[in-house]
Amino acid sequence: CSHFEIDFLVLQDILNADHPTKIEEHDKYIVLILKIFYPNEHKEEDELDELLQQQVCLILGNNYVLTFLEKETDFFDDVSSALRNDVLKIRSRQTDYLLSVLLNSIMGNYISTISSIDDALEDLEEELLTITSGDDIGIQIQALRRQYMLMKKSILPLKEQYIKLLRAENLLIHKVNRA
């Protein structure tokens, strides 16, 4: 990372998988530390659905975007495919556009995951109203609410920081890519 002149403290943040969500501007680059969420596909049949999270770090510099993932994943395969096949004309645009495509993928993940949790909660609440046994529905509802709160804790700090980033006079984000 010496080639990109990434500060030592930023490298520590990248390596700390428990780092809170943040967007931080530096002289030569912008750092975004985010979480992605996905279901545990290796759970036992009798286990409750578990939401796993992984840290993603994006660094936007002059003519480059670096991505760091906590674990190997296919999360950005759609973006890689779009780059290879020039679907969104990403290569002919500035690097801040690539950053916006990556962020759009992460936001899509947030929306679909929240929607899945919401649907599961609705189903459980409906089931709770139609049966009297109670089974373990209360426990499942609590687990889903905890997943929801985990996501909320990671996503809410982004709102304020994202707005601040788009309003800043940062030369790395071009006016055409500010939403």
Question: Which residues fall in each region the model found?
Answer:
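Peripheral, non-transmembrane regulatory/ligand-interaction domains of membrane transport proteins
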Residues: 1-177
